[in-house]
Swiss-Prot record:
Keyword Methyltransferase: no
GO MF, one example: DNA binding
Gene label: cap4
Tagged with keyword DNA-binding: yes
Domain of life: Bacteria
InterPro entries found in the cross-reference section: SAVED
Requisite cofactors: Mg(2+)
Region (N-terminal endonuclease domain): 1-226
Organism (species): Enterobacter hormaechei subsp. hoffmannii (strain UCI 50)
UniProt-reported outcome of changing Y493A: Greatly reduced DNase activity
Record-given protein name: CD-NTase-associated protein 4
Length: 499
């Protein structure tokens, strides 16, 4: 099969999977404000791949409520593609010949309701050092109008962006350009095609529909193609339920009723809003720049109280929680401490990974061997470090940091899965629980002095971090650490919470 044909198929399948994820909200009782989802229906050109409508309008990260989300979905087979601010005036960037994405945005803003949001969703990434990357919000992908319209002249770095876009759109003033760009979101580096398959499966599992886990052909891709051939593009809540019944997708047993709760210090893009209702979501995105807190924001003084207050409220009102943890490992551990064994809350975790999302619970069956645990003496201090090498070997970097910065640490307890570290080394929720319990037992046996601290360096799925956090009430004073993957600081570890 020609590569171009295969790429075209993959592009349609990617778009279809995005549609199914959005459509699953029509059967989610916690998202009853979602009233219609359409797929390549009549809508503003270039923003009609998927359209989601709300009544009442959904909340946004700003003061306005959103009546509809319009999506342009752009997929590439490889991750080699990248783009910058100049590409937004090139019709070829969206596979068109005449109109650019910005021209289509301007047209759409003139025909659609004022409180609409328009999204460019792409697997491509923004070119390093391109000015576009400096004006995209890490919170919701919107254009940071305060950053773009910064009072500089057209000869400045941001001014060149404004001038190019303004002239391309035949606008006279920056004020007119600002009106066009308001409500425009760019979501780069979106999940892979395979990860989107797992997201569909997870969304369908939550609402009580069958999934497609093992077949090489993903049945819902074919179902989307069939809908297009039948010219069935729009679905209300009633119509989507009827489709599920027609296709025999509804499971015989009703799904358990868990309250969706989301903690977020990283973003997956526009799909984030599906995780949980705003009142059950704590977004910490505005407190971070990359992997580390923004200037003036401290882990213990600012971030920790927000997490604790939010989860205390959840613990007081909910008994069954499905927890979405798109967070730093330290926040996942703190969440486990807040929702510990004595909280009385039954927890189901949505584990995020490179291959998509999956639901993990501590009640799953597992027969994995115990983790391999080795203890190394590195000094005479009374503190102990636990290094979790679950997804990668964290020991060399952790040991180097400890020897240079933490003379009070005398022993390192190193934990690796019996089958070796890697992205798939933890099989499910019960396996994660078993690892956390084993680590807790070893630390208890280490007999730390009362005045000593336990230092935790984790390269592990957040499920392991969460379950280990549930044990920290019994482990004395604990210090969590974050690794500088992006070399924002020194490419090593830095302490985060002390609990």
């Amino acid at each position: 099969m020609a590569t171009s044909v295969l790429a075209n198929w993959h592009g349609h399948d990617y778009q279809a999977r995005y549609f199914w994820i959005e459509a699953s909200r029509l059967k989610n009782p916690q998202q009853d404000f979602v009233v219609e989802v359409s797929y390549e229906a009549d809508g503003p050109k270039a923003f009609d791949d998927v359209i989601t409508r709300y009544n009442p309008p959904r909340r946004s990260t700003g003061p306005d409520r959103i009546q509809a989300d319009y999506y342009q979905i752009k997929f590439h087979v490889t991750q080699a593609a990248s783009f910058g601010f100049e590409d937004l005036i090139d019709p070829a960037f969206i596979g068109a010949e005449t109109f650019s994405i910005l021209e289509r945005l301007k047209q759409a803003k003139g025909t659609e309701p004022a409180n609409s949001a328009f999204h460019l969703v792409t697997t491509d990434r923004i070119i390093d050092e391109d000015p576009l990357g400096e004006i995209i919000s890490n919170v919701d992908g919107s254009i940071r109008l305060d950053k773009l319209f910064d009072g500089t002249t057209d000869r400045s770095r941001k001014g060149k962006v404004r001038k190019l876009w303004r002239q391309h759109l035949k606008l006279s003033t920056d004020q007119e350009l600002e009106q066009v760009l308001s409500g425009f979101h760019i979501q780069q580096s979106q999940p892979t095609l395979e990860a989107m398959r797992e997201k569909v499966n997870t969304c369908f599992q939550i609402i009580g529909l069958i999934t497609c886990e093992t077949s090489s052909d993903f049945r819902f891709d074919g179902a989307a193609r069939a809908l297009r051939s039948q010219e069935r593009y729009r679905f209300t809540r009633e119509q989507f339920t009827a489709l599920c019944e027609e296709e025999n997708w509804i499971r015989s047993e009703a799904p358990e009723s868990f309250r969706n709760v989301a903690l977020r210090s990283f973003s997956d893009g526009p799909l984030d809003i599906m995780d949980a209702l705003p009142e059950h979501t704590l977004s910490l995105l505005s407190l971070f720049e990359g992997r580390f807190p923004s200037p003036g924001i401290e882990w213990n003084d600012v971030i920790k109280p927000q997490v604790e207050t939010f989860l205390t409220g959840i613990r007081q009102t909910e008994r069954k929680v499905r927890l979405y943890l798109n967070t730093h490992s330290s926040i996942a551990m703190l969440a486990g401490k807040c929702l510990g064994h004595k909280s009385g809350v039954e927890i189901e975790l949505v584990q995020k990974g490179r291959m998509g999302d999956s639901i993990w619970s501590e009640n799953e069956s597992q027969d994995e061997p115990d983790a391999v645990i080795e203890t190394e003496t590195v000094g005479t201090g009374s503190d102990v470090a636990v290094v979790l090498s679950i997804t990668r070997n964290a020991l060399p970097k952790a040991r180097a940091y400890i020897l240079e910065n933490q003379p009070d640490i005398g022993r390192i307890i190193h934990v690796t899965p019996a089958n070796g570290h890697g992205q798939r080394s933890v099989k499910n929720g019960s396996h994660a629980v078993a690892i956390a319990e084993q680590v807790s037992d070893v630390v208890m046996d280490a007999d730390l002095p009362v005045e000593a601290s336990l230092h935790i360096f984790s390269a592990a799925p957040n499920a392991v971090n969460f379950y280990l956090g549930q044990h920290t009430d019994f482990l004395g004073t604990c210090v969590f650490y974050e690794f500088d993957f992006q070399r924002q600081r020194d490419g090593s570890y830095l302490p985060s919470f002390k609990v």
